Amino acid sequence: NTLDSKCLQYGVEIHDRMQAEALIHDGERCMGAIVRSLRDGELVAYIAKATLIATGGYGRIYRATTNAIICDGGGQICALNTGVVPLGNMEAIQFHPTGSVPTDILMTEGCRGDGGTLLDVNEYRFMPDYEPEKAELASRDVVSRRMTEHMRKGFGVKSPYGDHLWLDIRHLGEHHITTKLREIYDICTHFLGVNPIHQLIPVRPTQHYSMGGVRTDKDGHAYGLKGLFAAGEAACWDLHGFNRLGGNSLAETVVSGRYIGSKMVEYLKGSESVFKTEPVNDARKLVAKTIDDIISCRNGKENCFDLRNAMQDIMMDDVGIFRNAKDLQNGVDRLLELSERAKHIGLHGSVKGFTPELS
Protein backbone atom coordinates (compact mmCIF):
# COMPACT_ATOMS: atom_id res chain seq x y z
CA ASN A 1 0.00 0.00 0.00
CA THR A 2 0.94 3.68 -0.10
CA LEU A 3 2.38 3.78 3.43
CA ASP A 4 4.60 0.75 2.84
CA SER A 5 5.81 2.21 -0.45
CA LYS A 6 6.73 5.51 1.20
CA CYS A 7 8.55 3.72 4.02
CA LEU A 8 10.56 1.72 1.50
CA GLN A 9 11.27 4.88 -0.49
CA TYR A 10 12.79 6.58 2.54
CA GLY A 11 14.57 3.50 3.86
CA VAL A 12 12.36 3.03 6.91
CA GLU A 13 12.73 -0.49 8.28
CA ILE A 14 9.39 -2.29 8.66
CA HIS A 15 8.95 -5.03 11.24
CA ASP A 16 5.70 -6.71 10.27
CA ARG A 17 3.76 -9.37 12.17
CA MET A 18 4.85 -7.89 15.48
CA GLN A 19 2.35 -6.96 18.19
CA ALA A 20 3.07 -4.51 21.03
CA GLU A 21 2.17 -6.06 24.39
CA ALA A 22 3.41 -3.49 26.92
CA LEU A 23 5.30 -0.22 27.23
CA ILE A 24 8.69 -0.15 28.93
CA HIS A 25 8.85 2.59 31.56
CA ASP A 26 10.08 3.50 35.02
CA GLY A 27 7.04 5.51 36.03
CA GLU A 28 8.44 8.73 34.61
CA ARG A 29 9.92 7.95 31.20
CA CYS A 30 8.89 5.64 28.37
CA MET A 31 11.77 3.59 26.96
CA GLY A 32 10.06 1.63 24.20
CA ALA A 33 7.86 -1.45 24.10
CA ILE A 34 7.81 -5.20 24.61
CA VAL A 35 6.67 -6.73 21.34
CA ARG A 36 5.52 -10.28 20.54
CA SER A 37 6.41 -11.90 17.24
CA LEU A 38 3.27 -13.34 15.66
CA ARG A 39 5.47 -15.83 13.83
CA ASP A 40 6.99 -17.70 16.77
CA GLY A 41 5.89 -15.90 19.94
CA GLU A 42 9.33 -14.50 20.75
CA LEU A 43 9.24 -11.42 22.98
CA VAL A 44 11.46 -8.59 21.79
CA ALA A 45 12.33 -5.40 23.64
CA TYR A 46 12.32 -2.37 21.35
CA ILE A 47 14.34 0.30 23.14
CA ALA A 48 13.58 3.87 22.07
CA LYS A 49 14.04 7.43 23.27
CA ALA A 50 10.65 8.28 21.78
CA THR A 51 7.68 5.95 21.30
CA LEU A 52 4.58 6.71 19.22
CA ILE A 53 1.23 4.97 19.68
CA ALA A 54 -0.60 5.07 16.33
CA THR A 55 -2.71 1.92 16.56
CA GLY A 56 -6.06 3.37 15.55
CA GLY A 57 -9.33 3.28 17.43
CA TYR A 58 -11.18 0.74 19.55
CA GLY A 59 -14.30 0.11 17.49
CA ARG A 60 -14.00 -3.66 17.77
CA ILE A 61 -15.37 -3.54 21.30
CA TYR A 62 -18.73 -3.15 19.49
CA ARG A 63 -20.45 -5.92 17.55
CA ALA A 64 -21.31 -3.71 14.57
CA THR A 65 -18.33 -1.62 13.46
CA THR A 66 -16.72 -0.45 10.25
CA ASN A 67 -13.28 -0.68 11.89
CA ALA A 68 -10.60 -3.13 10.79
CA ILE A 69 -10.20 -6.25 12.91
CA ILE A 70 -7.00 -4.89 14.48
CA CYS A 71 -8.77 -1.82 15.90
CA ASP A 72 -9.42 -3.37 19.30
CA GLY A 73 -7.87 -0.71 21.52
CA GLY A 74 -4.52 -2.45 21.92
CA GLY A 75 -2.54 0.79 21.96
CA GLN A 76 -4.85 2.40 24.49
CA ILE A 77 -4.58 -0.69 26.70
CA CYS A 78 -0.77 -0.52 26.64
CA ALA A 79 -0.95 3.11 27.78
CA LEU A 80 -3.56 2.43 30.46
CA ASN A 81 -1.63 -0.53 31.85
CA THR A 82 1.28 1.75 32.74
CA GLY A 83 -0.85 3.08 35.57
CA VAL A 84 0.34 6.63 34.91
CA VAL A 85 -0.83 7.48 31.37
CA PRO A 86 -4.46 8.68 31.27
CA LEU A 87 -7.01 8.04 28.56
CA GLY A 88 -9.42 10.78 27.55
CA ASN A 89 -13.02 10.94 26.25
CA MET A 90 -13.27 7.18 25.83
CA GLU A 91 -17.06 7.47 25.86
CA ALA A 92 -16.98 9.64 22.72
CA ILE A 93 -18.01 7.17 20.01
CA GLN A 94 -19.38 8.06 16.58
CA PHE A 95 -21.87 5.86 14.75
CA HIS A 96 -22.16 6.05 10.98
CA PRO A 97 -25.74 5.76 9.65
CA THR A 98 -25.04 3.39 6.79
CA GLY A 99 -22.98 0.36 7.64
CA SER A 100 -23.97 -2.51 5.36
CA VAL A 101 -25.67 -5.61 6.76
CA PRO A 102 -24.25 -8.10 7.59
CA THR A 103 -20.68 -7.10 6.69
CA ASP A 104 -20.68 -3.61 8.32
CA ILE A 105 -18.66 -2.28 5.39
CA LEU A 106 -19.24 1.46 5.10
CA MET A 107 -21.70 2.77 2.54
CA THR A 108 -20.21 6.20 1.92
CA GLU A 109 -22.14 9.38 2.65
CA GLY A 110 -21.73 10.11 -1.02
CA CYS A 111 -24.74 7.85 -1.57
CA ARG A 112 -26.99 10.19 0.38
CA GLY A 113 -25.14 13.26 -0.82
CA ASP A 114 -25.93 12.26 -4.39
CA GLY A 115 -29.60 11.79 -3.59
CA GLY A 116 -29.90 8.36 -1.98
CA THR A 117 -32.77 7.91 0.47
CA LEU A 118 -33.45 5.79 3.55
CA LEU A 119 -36.51 3.52 3.54
CA ASP A 120 -38.15 1.40 6.24
CA VAL A 121 -39.73 -2.05 6.16
CA ASN A 122 -42.67 -0.61 4.19
CA GLU A 123 -40.24 1.05 1.76
CA TYR A 124 -41.41 4.39 3.12
CA ARG A 125 -38.98 7.32 3.18
CA PHE A 126 -39.06 8.32 6.86
CA MET A 127 -36.24 10.84 7.37
CA PRO A 128 -38.25 13.92 6.23
CA ASP A 129 -40.71 13.15 9.04
CA TYR A 130 -37.95 13.53 11.62
CA GLU A 131 -35.76 16.14 9.92
CA PRO A 132 -37.95 18.16 7.50
CA GLU A 133 -35.17 20.52 6.41
CA LYS A 134 -32.18 18.22 5.93
CA ALA A 135 -33.71 14.72 5.85
CA GLU A 136 -30.95 12.23 4.93
CA LEU A 137 -28.39 15.06 4.78
CA ALA A 138 -28.51 15.77 8.52
CA SER A 139 -25.29 15.12 10.46
CA ARG A 140 -24.17 11.55 11.09
CA ASP A 141 -25.19 11.46 14.73
CA VAL A 142 -28.66 12.82 13.96
CA VAL A 143 -29.34 10.38 11.12
CA SER A 144 -28.04 7.45 13.20
CA ARG A 145 -30.31 8.38 16.10
CA ARG A 146 -33.35 8.81 13.86
CA MET A 147 -32.73 5.47 12.17
CA THR A 148 -32.40 3.70 15.51
CA GLU A 149 -35.49 5.47 16.84
CA HIS A 150 -37.49 4.40 13.77
CA MET A 151 -36.39 0.78 14.12
CA ARG A 152 -37.30 0.78 17.80
CA LYS A 153 -40.81 1.82 16.78
CA GLY A 154 -41.08 -1.43 14.84
CA PHE A 155 -40.29 -0.21 11.34
CA GLY A 156 -37.03 -2.12 10.90
CA VAL A 157 -36.53 -4.94 8.43
CA LYS A 158 -36.12 -8.27 10.21
CA SER A 159 -33.10 -10.37 9.29
CA PRO A 160 -30.94 -13.15 10.79
CA TYR A 161 -28.39 -10.41 11.55
CA GLY A 162 -30.77 -8.10 13.38
CA ASP A 163 -33.02 -5.27 12.26
CA HIS A 164 -31.94 -2.97 9.46
CA LEU A 165 -33.30 -0.34 7.09
CA TRP A 166 -32.86 0.20 3.36
CA LEU A 167 -30.59 2.58 1.45
CA ASP A 168 -32.11 3.31 -1.95
CA ILE A 169 -29.95 4.63 -4.78
CA ARG A 170 -31.83 2.95 -7.63
CA HIS A 171 -33.26 6.24 -8.89
CA LEU A 172 -29.74 7.60 -9.48
CA GLY A 173 -29.47 5.36 -12.51
CA GLU A 174 -26.99 2.78 -13.76
CA HIS A 175 -24.49 5.24 -15.24
CA HIS A 176 -24.24 7.30 -12.05
CA ILE A 177 -23.93 4.23 -9.81
CA THR A 178 -21.28 2.50 -11.92
CA THR A 179 -19.19 5.66 -12.36
CA LYS A 180 -19.73 8.12 -9.49
CA LEU A 181 -20.45 5.39 -6.92
CA ARG A 182 -18.37 2.60 -8.43
CA GLU A 183 -16.93 1.50 -5.06
CA ILE A 184 -20.43 1.11 -3.62
CA TYR A 185 -21.48 -0.92 -6.65
CA ASP A 186 -18.47 -3.23 -6.24
CA ILE A 187 -19.00 -3.68 -2.48
CA CYS A 188 -22.68 -4.46 -2.93
CA THR A 189 -22.18 -6.97 -5.72
CA HIS A 190 -19.10 -8.70 -4.28
CA PHE A 191 -19.84 -8.72 -0.53
CA LEU A 192 -23.62 -8.38 -0.20
CA GLY A 193 -24.92 -10.15 -3.27
CA VAL A 194 -26.98 -7.06 -4.03
CA ASN A 195 -27.18 -5.13 -7.29
CA PRO A 196 -27.81 -1.52 -6.16
CA ILE A 197 -28.97 -0.55 -9.64
CA HIS A 198 -32.09 -2.63 -9.12
CA GLN A 199 -32.11 -3.60 -5.43
CA LEU A 200 -32.19 -1.90 -2.03
CA ILE A 201 -29.07 -1.95 0.15
CA PRO A 202 -29.49 -3.22 3.76
CA VAL A 203 -27.94 -0.73 6.22
CA ARG A 204 -27.93 0.11 9.92
CA PRO A 205 -26.09 2.56 12.21
CA THR A 206 -22.63 1.14 12.86
CA GLN A 207 -19.77 2.18 15.15
CA HIS A 208 -17.36 4.10 12.97
CA TYR A 209 -14.92 6.37 14.82
CA SER A 210 -13.43 6.80 18.30
CA MET A 211 -12.84 10.38 19.42
CA GLY A 212 -11.23 9.19 22.67
CA GLY A 213 -7.81 7.70 23.18
CA VAL A 214 -4.45 8.32 24.83
CA ARG A 215 -4.67 11.78 26.34
CA THR A 216 -2.02 14.09 24.84
CA ASP A 217 -1.04 17.73 24.87
CA LYS A 218 -1.07 19.89 21.73
CA ASP A 219 2.28 18.43 20.65
CA GLY A 220 1.06 14.84 20.82
CA HIS A 221 3.05 14.13 23.99
CA ALA A 222 1.14 11.74 26.26
CA TYR A 223 0.55 12.86 29.81
CA GLY A 224 2.25 10.82 32.51
CA LEU A 225 5.35 9.57 30.69
CA LYS A 226 8.14 11.49 29.00
CA GLY A 227 9.01 10.16 25.58
CA LEU A 228 5.56 8.71 24.86
CA PHE A 229 3.51 10.19 22.01
CA ALA A 230 0.20 9.28 20.40
CA ALA A 231 -1.40 10.33 17.12
CA GLY A 232 -4.42 9.70 14.94
CA GLU A 233 -7.43 7.78 16.17
CA ALA A 234 -5.33 6.20 18.95
CA ALA A 235 -5.00 9.61 20.60
CA CYS A 236 -7.30 12.04 22.33
CA TRP A 237 -5.80 15.14 20.72
CA ASP A 238 -9.08 17.01 21.17
CA LEU A 239 -9.30 18.00 17.52
CA HIS A 240 -12.80 16.57 17.00
CA GLY A 241 -14.45 17.20 20.34
CA PHE A 242 -17.24 14.68 20.90
CA ASN A 243 -18.52 14.47 17.31
CA ARG A 244 -16.12 14.30 14.37
CA LEU A 245 -17.18 15.88 11.08
CA GLY A 246 -16.94 13.67 8.00
CA GLY A 247 -13.50 13.79 6.35
CA ASN A 248 -11.77 15.47 9.29
CA SER A 249 -9.96 12.33 10.40
CA LEU A 250 -8.04 12.27 7.12
CA ALA A 251 -7.05 15.88 7.68
CA GLU A 252 -6.02 15.01 11.23
CA THR A 253 -3.87 12.13 10.00
CA VAL A 254 -2.00 14.34 7.56
CA VAL A 255 -1.58 17.26 9.96
CA SER A 256 -0.82 15.31 13.13
CA GLY A 257 1.60 12.99 11.35
CA ARG A 258 3.72 15.89 10.18
CA TYR A 259 3.32 18.09 13.26
CA ILE A 260 3.71 15.46 15.98
CA GLY A 261 6.52 13.85 14.01
CA SER A 262 8.42 17.14 14.07
CA LYS A 263 7.81 17.46 17.82
CA MET A 264 9.19 13.96 18.35
CA VAL A 265 12.35 14.95 16.49
CA GLU A 266 12.71 17.99 18.74
CA TYR A 267 12.29 15.77 21.79
CA LEU A 268 14.89 13.30 20.52
CA LYS A 269 17.49 16.02 20.11
CA GLY A 270 17.19 16.98 23.75
CA SER A 271 16.78 13.55 25.37
CA GLU A 272 19.40 11.26 26.87
CA SER A 273 20.37 7.91 25.37
CA VAL A 274 21.06 6.14 28.66
CA PHE A 275 18.50 3.46 29.57
CA LYS A 276 18.05 1.48 32.74
CA THR A 277 18.01 -2.29 32.23
CA GLU A 278 15.70 -3.04 35.16
CA PRO A 279 12.49 -1.60 33.62
CA VAL A 280 13.21 -3.51 30.40
CA ASN A 281 13.69 -6.82 32.18
CA ASP A 282 10.69 -6.24 34.44
CA ALA A 283 8.40 -5.44 31.52
CA ARG A 284 9.53 -8.49 29.56
CA LYS A 285 9.10 -10.81 32.55
CA LEU A 286 5.62 -9.46 33.25
CA VAL A 287 4.47 -9.98 29.66
CA ALA A 288 5.99 -13.47 29.56
CA LYS A 289 4.25 -14.41 32.82
CA THR A 290 0.93 -13.04 31.61
CA ILE A 291 1.10 -15.08 28.41
CA ASP A 292 2.22 -18.23 30.26
CA ASP A 293 -0.61 -17.85 32.77
CA ILE A 294 -3.17 -17.51 29.98
CA ILE A 295 -1.83 -20.49 28.04
CA SER A 296 -1.72 -22.66 31.17
CA CYS A 297 -5.50 -22.25 31.55
CA ARG A 298 -6.31 -25.29 29.41
CA ASN A 299 -9.10 -26.64 31.59
CA GLY A 300 -11.17 -23.49 31.98
CA LYS A 301 -14.82 -23.72 30.98
CA GLU A 302 -15.12 -20.29 29.35
CA ASN A 303 -14.47 -19.67 25.66
CA CYS A 304 -12.64 -16.40 24.98
CA PHE A 305 -14.53 -15.80 21.73
CA ASP A 306 -17.89 -16.25 23.44
CA LEU A 307 -16.86 -13.71 26.06
CA ARG A 308 -15.70 -11.26 23.41
CA ASN A 309 -18.98 -11.59 21.52
CA ALA A 310 -20.92 -11.07 24.74
CA MET A 311 -18.89 -7.92 25.46
CA GLN A 312 -19.61 -6.57 21.99
CA ASP A 313 -23.33 -7.20 22.44
CA ILE A 314 -23.32 -5.42 25.81
CA MET A 315 -21.64 -2.40 24.27
CA MET A 316 -24.20 -2.30 21.45
CA ASP A 317 -27.15 -2.73 23.81
CA ASP A 318 -26.19 -0.50 26.73
CA VAL A 319 -23.43 1.85 25.50
CA GLY A 320 -24.66 2.56 21.99
CA ILE A 321 -26.30 5.47 20.24
CA PHE A 322 -28.79 6.21 23.02
CA ARG A 323 -27.42 6.29 26.57
CA ASN A 324 -29.07 6.69 29.94
CA ALA A 325 -28.19 5.94 33.56
CA LYS A 326 -30.20 2.71 33.70
CA ASP A 327 -28.65 1.17 30.59
CA LEU A 328 -25.14 2.32 31.47
CA GLN A 329 -25.37 0.78 34.94
CA ASN A 330 -26.76 -2.39 33.43
CA GLY A 331 -23.83 -2.45 31.03
CA VAL A 332 -21.33 -2.00 33.86
CA ASP A 333 -22.91 -4.83 35.85
CA ARG A 334 -22.88 -7.17 32.86
CA LEU A 335 -19.26 -6.31 32.02
CA LEU A 336 -18.22 -7.02 35.61
CA GLU A 337 -19.86 -10.44 35.31
CA LEU A 338 -17.88 -11.07 32.12
CA SER A 339 -14.70 -10.01 33.89
CA GLU A 340 -15.32 -12.68 36.53
CA ARG A 341 -16.03 -15.30 33.87
CA ALA A 342 -12.81 -14.32 32.07
CA LYS A 343 -10.85 -15.69 35.04
CA HIS A 344 -11.94 -19.18 33.93
CA ILE A 345 -11.02 -19.03 30.24
CA GLY A 346 -9.79 -22.25 28.68
CA LEU A 347 -7.62 -22.04 25.56
CA HIS A 348 -7.60 -24.63 22.81
CA GLY A 349 -3.95 -24.18 21.88
CA SER A 350 -0.57 -23.47 23.43
CA VAL A 351 1.03 -21.56 20.55
CA LYS A 352 2.63 -18.26 21.59
CA GLY A 353 2.89 -16.89 18.08
CA PHE A 354 -0.07 -16.13 15.87
CA THR A 355 -3.25 -17.23 17.60
CA PRO A 356 -6.50 -15.25 17.82
CA GLU A 357 -6.91 -16.50 21.40
CA LEU A 358 -3.94 -14.41 22.55
CA SER A 359 -4.71 -11.43 20.34
State where each predicted segment sits.
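An anion/pyrophosphate-binding glycine-rich loop and adjacent beta-alpha core
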Residues: 78, 85-195, 199, 263-270, ...
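Glycine- and aromatic-enriched mobile tails/lids
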Residues: 119-128, 132-137, 156, 209-211, ...
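A short, glycine/Asx- and small/polar-enriched loop/turn
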Residues: 25-31
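A conserved beta-strand/loop element that lines the FAD pocket in flavoprotein oxidoreductases
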Residues: 8-20
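General beta-strand structural signal in soluble alpha/beta enzymes
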Residues: 14-17, 45-47, 53-54, 87-92, ...
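Glycine-rich loop(s) and the adjacent beta-strand/alpha-helix scaffold that form part
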Residues: 50-105, 137, 152, 159, ...
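Short beta-strand to alpha-helix junction loop
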Residues: 1-5, 15, 65-73, 100-102, ...
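Core beta-strand elements of the Rossmann-like FAD/NAD(P) dinucleotide-binding domain
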Residues: 40-50, 223-225
